[in-house]
Design a protein with these regions (language model features):
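Active-site hotspot residues in diverse enzymes, especially metal/ion-binding acidic/histidine motifs
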Residues: 1-140
Length: 140
């Protein structure tokens, strides 16, 4: 089963609706609804299968840990919610052990790693920084 299919299956198994429709500015978003969650993706703003997987897994991250921010409260930190959603997506799409093994096998350029894991280059950069700077993991 390919990565995108497994993400959609994960959403289905967890009663998370995923819908597609054009949006003015957003590329994707998720909202809590009745004890579960719904995700919207703008199909006109999906640039590749890798981009779709990154966007979907990020929004699933919001749904899984319940990280939704409220612009009307001063106590809500948007960056914190975004980082948690990205971290969930990283663990799902680029597990540390597999990333470390890929590097050990000689796949060292960001574009090569992004291609290997079928994610965007920007997301791969975020994942590498997350593992090496925040988690202090080493490639040795």
């Amino acid at each position: 089963m390919d990565r995108r299919t497994s993400l959609y299956l994960y959403a289905w198994r967890n009663h998370i609706d995923v819908d597609y429709f054009p949006m003015q500015t957003a590329e994707a978003f998720s909202v809590p609804i009745g004890g579960t969650c719904a995700i919207a993706l703008d199909p006109t703003k999906i640039r590749s299968e890798a981009d779709e997987a990154v966007k979907l897994s990020h929004e699933l991250g919001h749904c899984v840990y319940g990280g939704f921010y409220n612009k009307y409260t001063p106590f809500d930190v948007r960056a914190q919610h975004e980082n948690k959603a990205n971290a969930w997506a990283v663990y799902r799409l680029i597990p540390w052990g597999k990333l470390k093994q890929a590097v050990k096998n000689g796949i060292t350029e960001v574009w090569e790693l992004a291609e290997y894991f079928d994610v965007t280059e920007d997301f791969m950069r975020w994942a590498i920084a997350y593992y090496t700077e925040r988690k202090n993991y080493k490639f040795e």
